[in-house]
């Protein structure tokens, strides 16, 4: 009995010292609360990606194993691993709470601050004054003017008209893709009952002050996942859409050429309804259509350790063996080259003049440290932009095979996310896995704009975007389209 009472007294003394330390530490935190105001970056909202650390806002507080410090309540809470409570406190929930707090703050800044400045010291009046004084040439003036317009774009919700309004309320956007002239938008929607549905949105009505567009339905329906898609110019420019569909059960994957003339009320002048063509190509990760005269009416598909180049007219195929899965592809227009990005981080070009026998077909080799998710060839075909699953975006010089610029701020861990390069405006757009849309300057890699998602951050609700120099056709203004869940938003130049 004496031994048990001695243990009890020792336990009370130990608990008293432990609780006294917590009270003293909490008191100090309350005293220093006014002095520990951490700056949140510039007022234009161009901050970095949300931190993945659960103690990002309390770096001066010691990290206690098994405890979490709440900067709002100024106290520690115990983490409960494996607890079967309906709302356990976990690091993931803490991180989601911090990300949601930052998203709401950025949305509030977007609504309150109509005019923003992409670069310090540059606004409309200063640009005009420097141009008149001869400090800026015409090229620099146009580039900086575009950057200023991008920083001032405001979000407007687009009204979508359809013959089936009930479907618009339930079907969620998965992918969107603008055509070359930016007067059509091809969409892939996830249907509530399962599967996918395709549509084409006419952008001719996308004008201020009423942003109203029409969705053209079609009867084509598939329950298979779309791995990749691109526009195909078979009969004329952007006459078809090339889709890579994933196989299910005993049905193998395929590459499908879907004529846009099959869509209701979407027949161009003199355009007859086309025929849907399917090619049995299982397990395609990526696809690209060739506008090169040396590979006319051909498309490529990136498979597991293989690249296929297929002629639509003759059905002839060329196969090129690779050492890794090919996740992204793009044809050059003037040079007879097909650029490929692999899961291993390698970027290589296939010389289309060579046959698939031998090793002479590999023309250029570049390397990233992670899986390459997107490659974009610039207009003069001397540089290539590439991004990977580590969030790295690099601009490569194809003549010297060296990286000449890196774009910071992109967030990606494992998603297949595209890049959108627009040289006319001098910008590059990418959506991160954190659901933030970021816009950079092609000229120097400056982060010009960070746009939060209208919905809470979720890996299932990553926005799909399309930027165009002329939204709605030849007379349209530059702008950005963002599709997330059932909604379509437009960010246009004011």
Curated annotation (Swiss-Prot):
Disulphide bonds annotated for this chain are none
Q: Where is this region: Disordered?
A: 1-65
Please provide, in alphabetical order, the Gene Ontology terms of the cellular component aspect for this entry: Cul4-RING E3 ubiquitin ligase complex
Name its pathway.
Protein modification; protein ubiquitination
Q: Which residue windows does the record flag with biased composition (Low complexity)?
A: 51-60
Q: Where are the WD repeats?
A: 367-406, 409-450
Any idea what this protein is called? Answer: DDB1- and CUL4-associated factor 4
**Protein's gene:** DCAF4
């Amino acid at each position: 009995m004496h031994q048990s009472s001695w243990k009890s007294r020792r336990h009370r003394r130990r608990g008293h010292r432990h609780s006294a330390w917590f009270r003293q530490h909490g008191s100090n935190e309350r005293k220093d609360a006014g002095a520990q105001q951490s700056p949140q970056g510039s007022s234009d909202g161009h901050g970095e990606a949300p931190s993945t650390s659960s103690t990002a806002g309390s770096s001066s507080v010691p990290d206690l194993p098994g405890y979490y410090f709440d900067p709002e309540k100024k106290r520690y809470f115990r983490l409960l691993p494996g607890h079967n409570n309906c709302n356990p406190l976990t690091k993931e929930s803490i991180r989601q709470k911090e990300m949601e707090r930052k998203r709401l703050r950025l949305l509030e800044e977007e609504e309150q601050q109509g005019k923003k400045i992409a670069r310090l010291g540059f606004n409309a009046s200063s640009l005009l004054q420097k141009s008149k004084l001869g400090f800026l040439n015409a090229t620099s003036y146009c580039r900086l003017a575009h950057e200023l317009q991008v920083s001032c774009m405001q979000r407007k919700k687009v009204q979508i008209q359809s013959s089936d309004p009930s479907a618009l309320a339930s079907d969620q956007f998965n992918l969107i893709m603008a055509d070359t002239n930016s007067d059509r938008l091809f969409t892939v929607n996830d249907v509530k009952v399962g599967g996918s549905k395709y549509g084409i949105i006419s952008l001719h009505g996308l004008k201020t002050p009423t942003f109203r567009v029409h969705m053209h339905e079609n009867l084509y329906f598939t329950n298979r996942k779309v791995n990749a898609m691109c526009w195909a110019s078979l009969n004329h420019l952007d006459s078809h859409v090339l889709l890579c569909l994933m196989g299910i059960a005993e049905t193998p994957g395929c590459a499908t050429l879907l004529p846009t003339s099959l869509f209701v009320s979407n027949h161009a002048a003199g355009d007859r309804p086309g025929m849907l063509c399917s090619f049995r190509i299982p397990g395609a990760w990526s696809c690209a259509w060739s506008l090169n005269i040396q590979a006319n009416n051909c498309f490529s598909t990136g498979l597991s350790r293989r690249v296929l180049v297929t002629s639509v007219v003759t059905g002839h195929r060329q196969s090129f063996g690779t050492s890794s899965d090919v996740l992204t592809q793009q044809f050059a227009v003037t040079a007879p080259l097909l650029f490929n990005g692999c899961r291993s981080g390698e970027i290589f070009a296939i010389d289309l003049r060579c046959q698939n026998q031998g090793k002479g077909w590999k023309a250029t080799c570049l390397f990233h440290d992670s899986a390459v998710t997107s490659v974009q060839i610039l207009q003069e075909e001397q540089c290539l932009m590439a991004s990977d699953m580590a969030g790295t975006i690099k601009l490569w010089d194809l003549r010297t095979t060296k990286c000449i610029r890196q774009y910071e701020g992109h967030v990606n861990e494992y998603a297949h996310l595209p890049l959108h390069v627009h040289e006319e405006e001098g910008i590059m757009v990418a959506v991160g896995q954190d659901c933030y849309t970021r816009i950079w300057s092609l000229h120097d890699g400056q982060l010009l704009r960070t746009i939060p998602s209208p919905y809470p951050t979720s890996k299932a609700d990553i926005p799909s975007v399309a930027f165009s120099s002329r939204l709605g056709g030849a007379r349209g203004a530059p702008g950005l389209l963002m599709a997330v869940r059932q909604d379509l938003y437009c960010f246009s130049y004011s």
